[in-house]
Amino acid sequence: VSIIILDLDNCIANDEWRIKEIDWEQDNPTARYHNYHGLAAFDEPGNTDLFNCLVPHDIVVFTARPKFYGAPTAEWLKRNGINFSLLFMRDNNDHTHSKELKRRFLVELIQGMGVDPGKIVCAYDDRDDVVEMYKKLGIPAEVRKIHDTCAYTAPSKILLTHQEQ
């Protein structure tokens, strides 16, 4: 059986509308992203060609969302017709960078669960660094994203000044 790996936020789930809910005043990432993750069940799906019923592969989902949001995440996947075989989520209060986190997920899939890496047809993610990591490990990978709004960098403070003439 062949496998594809899908990222969730901004790859198959359109999270752009909830990025404004990230509380950049919070130092703790769990608190910072709580409202953002809590609203994920209301996302619209995107890049549906990656998971529609014509996709002949088993779907494995790698997401940086904490396990605390596991039930609504699994429900969203099912409600949107994403027939996933496995869902990998970060441990609660684990703030590991996405690239390293997904590398660990891949190691667990291959070494821990005995999946032949040759069966992985492609891994899709919205982040260039994650896609490069997959490629360096011999996994075909492609960047697929729905939008270009970053959920990892606080928006810059723009100061507008008005000059009177």
Where in the sequence are the language-model features?
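Alpha-helical substrate-recognition element adjacent to the catalytic core
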Residues: 2-96
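Conserved Lys-Pro-Asp/Glu-containing loop-to-beta segment of HAD-superfamily phosphomonoesterases
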Residues: 3, 102-128, 134
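Surface-exposed amphipathic alpha-helices with a cationic face
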Residues: 51-55, 110, 135
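Glycine-centered loop/turn motif at secondary-structure junctions
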Residues: 58, 81, 114, 138-140
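Short secondary-structure transition/capping segments
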Residues: 72-73, 98-100, 154-159
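Short, aromatic/basic amphipathic alpha-helical patches
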Residues: 73-81, 109, 132-138
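Acidic, Mg2+-coordinating phosphoryl-transfer loop and its flanking beta/alpha structural elements
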Residues: 118-164
